[in-house]
């Protein structure tokens, strides 16, 4: 299944696509794979975070998960093996979230090539402004990986135009300026950010940072997709099942007022 097909399928069902985020190797190697099996029935796409020692864009929940995964021995090689195992479980698009340093440490061509071979669909690069290293972005695309970059409510229209010119797969709209984390309500600026991005690209737009339940999912569902990370990682940290949270979020994504023009008959039962 391609990325565009995954978003189109969700849209045909009258909802935004659900993109769960899980940290590779957290809470353990086996626990990660169990979590993947739990989220896959609800997921349209899946985002896998590569643990990193200095995750500037991540809030405390994901920082703790990364630290624990690294202490337990998770590495780029370990993440490669996990991506390969996840790919054996699903045909849904798989995106690797990675900071730039591991890419440079392994060598971009080797890093991108190995993750493509392992089954990754694309890479999300939160700390790479694409216009600062267009050659690296082009290399990833030539190898066959889609490239996803972040835009924030503070992004200017000129910045949006630059980023979408380099993006493939989808565009990641950050709901708040700051780090990842759970919030009770998303700022109203997220609607305007999605509108401004969609005015400049035909690519799907996914909103992330702050989605923690049905209400925030409904707010974020003005976009084509919604990324849920910290809330899932916190549930894993606390030893809770992920299914109740995923069911609640899927209900929020199904709200027709967040998807104008859809008919009642387009609704489908949740998993």
UniProtKB/Swiss-Prot annotation:
Pathway annotation from the record: Amino-acid biosynthesis; L-tryptophan biosynthesis; L-tryptophan from chorismate: step 5/5
Gene Ontology molecular function terms on file: tryptophan synthase activity
Domain of life: Bacteria
Active site per UniProt: 47 (proton acceptor), 58 (proton acceptor)
One Pfam family in the UniProt entry: Trp_syntA
Complex formation: Tetramer of two alpha and two beta chains.
Reaction it catalyzes: (1S,2R)-1-C-(indol-3-yl)glycerol 3-phosphate + L-serine = D-glyceraldehyde 3-phosphate + L-tryptophan + H2O
Taxonomic lineage of the native organism: Bacteria, Thermotogati, Deinococcota, Deinococci, Thermales
Entry GO terms, CC: cytosol
Name of the protein: Tryptophan synthase alpha chain
């Amino acid at each position: 299944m391609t990325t565009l097909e995954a978003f189109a399928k969700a849209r045909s069902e009258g909802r935004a696509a659900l993109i769960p985020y899980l940290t590779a190797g957290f809470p353990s190697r086996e626990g990660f794979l169990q979590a993947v099996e739990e989220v896959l029935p609800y997921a349209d796409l899946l985002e896998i975070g590569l643990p990193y020692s200095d995750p500037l864009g991540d809030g405390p929940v994901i920082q703790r998960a990364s630290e624990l995964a690294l202490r337990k021995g998770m590495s780029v090689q370990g993440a490669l093996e996990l991506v390969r195992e996840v790919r054996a479980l699903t045909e849904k698009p798989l995106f690797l979230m990675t900071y730039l340093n591991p890419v440079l440490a392994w060598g971009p061509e080797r890093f991108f090539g190995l993750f493509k071979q392992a089954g990754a669909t694309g890479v999300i690069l939160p700390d790479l402004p694409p216009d600062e290293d267009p050659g690296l972005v082009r290399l990833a695309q030539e190898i066959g990986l889609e490239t996803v970059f972040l835009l924030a409510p503070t992004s200017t229209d000129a910045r949006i135009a630059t980023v979408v010119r380099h993006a493939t797969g989808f565009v990641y709209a950050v709901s708040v300026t700051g780090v990842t984390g759970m919030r009770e309500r998303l700022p109203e600026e997220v609607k305007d950010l999605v509108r401004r991005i969609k005015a400049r690209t035909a690519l799907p737009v996914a909103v992330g940072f702050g989605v923690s339940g049905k209400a925030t999912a409904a707010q974020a569902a003005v976009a084509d997709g919604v990324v849920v990370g910290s809330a899932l990682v916190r549930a894993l940290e606390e030893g809770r099942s992920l299914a109740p949270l995923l069911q609640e979020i899927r209900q929020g994504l199904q709200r027709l007022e967040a998807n104008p023009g859809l008919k009642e008959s387009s609704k489908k039962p949740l998993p």
